[in-house]
Regions:
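Hydrophobic, aromatic-rich transmembrane alpha-helices
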Residues: 2-12, 186-235
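Membrane-embedded, lumen/periplasm-facing catalytic core of multi-pass transferases
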Residues: 297-367, 459
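Transmembrane-helix signature of polytopic, membrane-embedded enzymes
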Residues: 6-37, 54, 243, 247
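Membrane-interface transmembrane helices that cradle and orient dolichyl/undecaprenyl
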Residues: 18-20, 59-76, 109
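Membrane-interface alpha helices of multi-pass inner-membrane proteins
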Residues: 76-92, 98-103, 132, 146, ...
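Hydrophobic/aromatic-rich transmembrane helices and adjacent perimembrane loops
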Residues: 48-55, 87-92, 96, 243-246, ...
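Perimembrane helix-loop-helix junctions
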Residues: 97-130, 138, 275
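Membrane-lumen/periplasm interface segments of specific transmembrane helices
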Residues: 120-191
């Protein structure tokens, strides 16, 4: 699907070429667009960054076709915006591309009245699409947590069920303008950003920046010279659909950096880079031989430089899930509680135990045992008042437990019964998982006694905890 959409977009961009050249270059651009660190790296992985790009490519195709035909209809704009809104409702990380699309439309529409009309139509249809896929869940979240985006933007809505925080992952957002300007080059060689982005390598962003910078510098000098002769600006020589895509790309890159900076969220830009490389090369030189040579050099270099995201892979087997859990340990499922104090993503194991078993995740991206949110208050009330069987899911030796395991044991007055544990086998986690039976320490509160607060400290770290 992505290949077909990219091929169609590229075909529109190269519509003035000869049929064979247009189809050949469109196919080449689509292939190179999908041969990138993100699309290759996420094949067979659990992320959905590449799948959601369908909600970016489809609206872009509708818009560039309308711009190329000079007959862009309001219906096409509504449909494109509606699709974009639905995609953003499914995965909000594509919001920067929706904003960039609106900015690109404002830039290529000639009249102020047309711009205002396009903006109003785009905004209304986008909101409708967003509510189609996300409205129900926003209402549920508001009803339960008084935050329609829970837990995100909780610094605005201030739900008592989470910390007063935006919960945004801004760990790789550029801190300075210089860092932002250097970001396209940060994945061309080993850097801290490349390492934090699954050891990726890619030249396409750097190549685009170099070409664009070259053209802008040349444009400045030519503009000074041609202004006296009344010549149009050089960038006006690009077709309207090419200018639209170029503005979209630049605006998306800027907004994406400001909001996230997370490499895999830029999957649409990775795929759209090849046709824009060709557009910039064609604007840079009019000589056919030079164009062919430069495009060939850029495409071959980009192809050879690609290093996909370094994702852990599972070997092929009879079943994706190969999990063995100790069902014999669960003698009374409705009265069984399993605690996950370690922040590792082990909750998938719940699907392999009886559905009546209750699981509580105490330390994760949403909440920590040291928090004072309603979530932790509910967890404390549950644990202190629980009279059934309790287990801890952790490593096979207390000496390699995470500090959060120890904190939970101490805070709630719990102890493991060292003679009662059961191994868990899963190819999705490192060997050594165990289900430990828990008991209350002598003198620890429990049953009908009030729940004291947890230890008010944050763990210092603890031994490394591999997946």
């Amino acid at each position: 699907l992505s290949f077909g959409l990219l091929f169609a977009i590229s075909s529109v961009v190269f519509r003035k070429w000869t049929p064979n050249a247009r189809l050949g270059m469109a196919a080449l651009c689509a292939a190179l667009g999908l041969y990138g660190p993100i699309f290759i790296g996420e094949l067979g992985a659990s992320e959905n960054d590449t799948l959601i790009t369908l909600f970016v490519f489809t609206p872009l195709l509708l818009l560039v076709r309308g711009l190329a035909a000079e007959s862009a209809s309001r219906t096409g704009l509504v449909v494109a915006s509606l699709i974009f809104g639905m995609g953003t409702g499914l995965k909000p990380t594509i919001a920067p591309f929706a904003v960039a699309t609106a900015l690109a439309l404002l830039a290529v529409v000639r009249s102020w009245r047309g711009r205002l009309t396009a903006l109003l139509i785009w905004s209304a249809a986008f909101l409708a699409g967003f509510l189609i896929t996300n409205g129900f869940w926003m209402a549920k979240l508001w009803q339960q947590f008084h935050n329609p985006f829970f837990p995100f933007y909780n610094d605005v809505f201030k739900s008592q069920w989470a910390n007063i925080s935006s919960y945004a992952d801004r760990g790789v957002v550029p801190k300075t303008i210089g860092e932002a300007l250097a970001r396209p080059f940060a994945v061309t060689y080993p850097t801290d950003y490349a390492a934090r982005s699954y050891q990726v390598r890619d030249l396409r962003y750097a190549a685009l920046v170099v070409l664009l910078g070259w053209i802008v510098v040349g444009w400045v000098f030519r503009r000074i010279r041609e202004r006296k002769k009344g010549q149009p600006w050089p960038l006006q020589s690009l077709s309207v659909e090419s200018r639209f895509l170029l503005i979209f790309f630049v605006a998306s890159f800027v907004i994406w950096q400001a909001m996230f900076g997370i490499f895999r969220y830029a999957a649409p830009l990775e795929a759209l880079a090849p046709p824009l490389l060709v557009v910039l090369v064609c604007d840079l030189t009019r000589r056919s031989v030079a164009r062919i040579a430069l495009v060939t050099l850029l495409f071959v270099s980009t192809f050879l430089a690609v290093k996909p995201m370094d994702q852990p892979r599972l070997p092929f087997g009879e079943s994706f899930w190969e999990v063995k859990v100790p069902t014999a340990a669960i003698t009374d499922p409705p009265n069984t509680l399993i605690l996950l104090a370690n922040p590792r993503p082990w909750a998938y194991l719940a699907a392999f135990l009886p559905p009546e078993v209750r699981w509580v995740g105490m330390n994760n991206n949403l909440t920590k045992v040291v928090d004072q949110s309603h979530t932790q208050m509910a967890i404390r009330a549950l644990i202190y008042g629980y009279t059934g069987d309790m287990f801890l899911l952790s490593r096979n030796k207390p000496s390699v437990w995470h500090d959060y395991d120890r904190l939970v044991m101490t805070a709630y007055g719990l102890q493991v019964v060292e003679s009662e544990w059961w191994p868990i086998e899963s190819k999705h986690s490192r060997p050594g998982l165990r289900l430990w039976r828990l008991r209350r320490a002598e003198g620890a509160p429990g049953g009908s006694e009030p729940a004291p607060p947890p230890i008010p400290r944050e763990p210092a770290g603890g031994p490394p905890d591999p997946p």
